[in-house]
Curated annotation (Swiss-Prot):
Pfam families given in the database record: Beta_elim_lyase
Required co-factors: pyridoxal 5'-phosphate
UniProt keyword list: Acetylation, Lyase, Pyridoxal phosphate, Tryptophan catabolism
Origin superkingdom: Bacteria
Assembly and binders: Homotetramer.
Species classification: Bacteria, Pseudomonadati, Pseudomonadota, Gammaproteobacteria, Enterobacterales
GO molecular function terms noted in the UniProt entry: tryptophanase activity
Annotated protein name in UniProt: Tryptophanase
Record-listed E.C. numbers: 4.1.99.1
Record gene name: tnaA
NCBIfam families for the chain: PRK13238.1 (NF009709), tnaA_trp_ase (TIGR02617)
Length: 471
């Protein structure tokens, strides 16, 4: 098997969900009704759903079996302690708060860290800035809701789809330290390390880069939060690309990675493979005060701290999923599936970001050069792909990035990308071939695809619920 060209799916399919086929006319009507926003399509009208890998994949038999052990006690559930034990064993973090998903963790820790910086360091809320290699959209949104400006400090290779680089998700370390000095260290409430960097194309961050980032953070006494949705994929890339760790296990690399943060926030719906769940964890007693404050907010916003909006069975499933998501054979297959899709698209001259961990990212700016950024070329491409083949994908570009909350002007985006997100253990190689063929048809009509403008624009996280029309 070692020398075969393609890895088959390393699992057997036991339960299937039928999907319906629709006509072009049906899909054209559906996308117009949705306001040219694939988020607002009904799932039953989607043939292949590449909107997200968040909670949309299959679960393992061990995860499904674990649900039967669920303790549904309101407080002190043994299922909570099973989850907390998994966190200690995998990440080395002592304090665990479950949440319903990643944004549940964000809405808790962000105001707590801002308040802590204000009380201990005299943070000026009118000047505060948080830094990241690239903020995930909800992390950015929660920061802005709390009055915190966000700044992404990424390397120059990150968004250049013509460049191949092992760790495109890395922090620009000089830019990070320069930015901290500019705003004043006391006005930086937190640094977020996003692994992998979703907005850059599911690109990994090296351990060397994380170490250096953490050293800078410690120099200025700034807390570091690891945004951990795709921690296992990041560990796999480190094993493959960072020579020092080629003989380490995924578990060993993961444990080493989390030495270089103080807290973790996780949407467990990605690499932990669960349909619902999140985590907020603190490494040790130095953040016990933060843990205490976050537990209090959890009661108000998520639920009692030993369930955090999750039923007992869901916590048991997550406790197992954290391990199952680190399986080396599984990760090798998953990364290879994404690479297969990217290779197939590039063979038909569809320019992509180099293959990342969870999705193929098409360079819509190059495919549709006639559509300006403020008419959202990747969103227009998403709508066309749905019309042609019933495939739902998601824009990662100017539409998602949004406006400057202070000036109201569109923020400049480094690339206009269309994300084709692969749900875990859900689609086969035949589906990948169908997606590639769909892009052949899209390319034939590319010159006739029109840009988009708003008919309804929310002020925060607009890409989820906005409505548009063709220009």
């Amino acid at each position: 098997m070692e020398n075969f060209k393609h890895l088959p799916e390393p699992f057997r399919i036991r339960v299937i969900e039928p999907v319906k086929r629709t006509t072009r006319a049906y899909r054209e009507e559906a996308i117009i009704k949705s306001g040219m926003n694939p988020f607002l399509l009904d799932s039953e009208d989607v043939f292949i759903d590449l909107l997200t890998d968040s909670g949309t994949g299959a679960v393992t038999q061990s995860m499904q079996a674990a649900m039967m052990r669920g303790d549904e006690a309101y407080s002190g559930s043994r299922s909570y302690y099973a989850l907390a034990e998994s966190v200690k064993n995998i990440f080395g973090y002592q304090y665990t708060i479950p949440t319903h998903q990643g944004r549940g963790a964000e809405q808790i820790y962000i105001p707590v860290l801002i308040k802590k910086r204000e009380q201990e360091k005299g943070l000026d809320r009118s000047k505060m800035v948080a830094f990241s290699n690239y903020f995930f959209d909800t992390t950015q949104g929660h920061s802005q809701i709390n009055g915190c400006t966000v700044r992404n400090v990424y390397i120059k290779e990150a968004f250049d789809t013509g460049v191949r680089y092992d760790f495109k998700g890395n922090f620009d370390l000089e830019g990070l330290e320069r930015g901290i000095e500019e705003v004043g260290p006391n006005n930086v409430p937190y640094i977020v390390a996003t692994i992998t960097s979703n907005s850059a194309g599911g690109q990994p961050v090296s351990l060397a880069n994380l170490k250096a980032m953490y050293s800078i953070a410690k120099k200025y006494d700034i807390p570091v939060v690891m945004d951990s949705a795709r921690f296992a994929e990041n560990a796999y890339f480190i094993k493959q690309r960072e020579a020092e760790y080629k003989d380490w296990t995924i578990e060993q690399i993961t444990r080493e990675t989390y030495k270089y943060a103080d807290m973790l926030a996780m949407s467990a719906k990605k690499d932990a493979m669960v349909p619902m769940g999140g985590l907020l964890c603190m490494k040790d007693d130095s953040f016990f005060d933060v843990y205490t404050e976050c537990r209090t907010l959890c009661v108000v916003q998520e639920g009692f701290p030993t369930y955090g909006g999750l039923e007992g069975g869901a916590m048991e499933r997550l406790a197992v999923g954290l391990y199952d998501g680190m399986n080396l054979d599984w990760l090798a297959y998953r990364i290879a599936q994404v690479q297969y899709l990217v290779d197939g698209l590039e063979e038909i001259d569809v320019v992509c970001q180099q293959a990342g961990g969870h999705a193929a990212f098409v360079d819509a700016g190059k495919l549709l050069p006639h559509i300006p950024a403020d008419q959202f070329p990747a969103q227009a491409l998403a709508c066309e792909l749905y019309k042609v083949a019933g495939i739902r994908a998601v824009e990662i570009g100017s539409f998602l990035l949004g406006r400057d909350p202070k000036t109201g002007k569109q923020l400049p985006c480094p690339a206009e990308l269309l994300r084709l997100t692969i749900p875990r253990a859900t689609y086969t190689q035949t589906h990948m071939d169908f997606i590639i063929e769909a892009f052949k048809h899209v390319k034939e009509n590319a010159a006739n695809i029109k840009g988009l403008t708003f008919t309804y624009e929310p002020k925060v996280l607009r890409h989820f619920t906005a409505k548009l029309k063709e220009v």
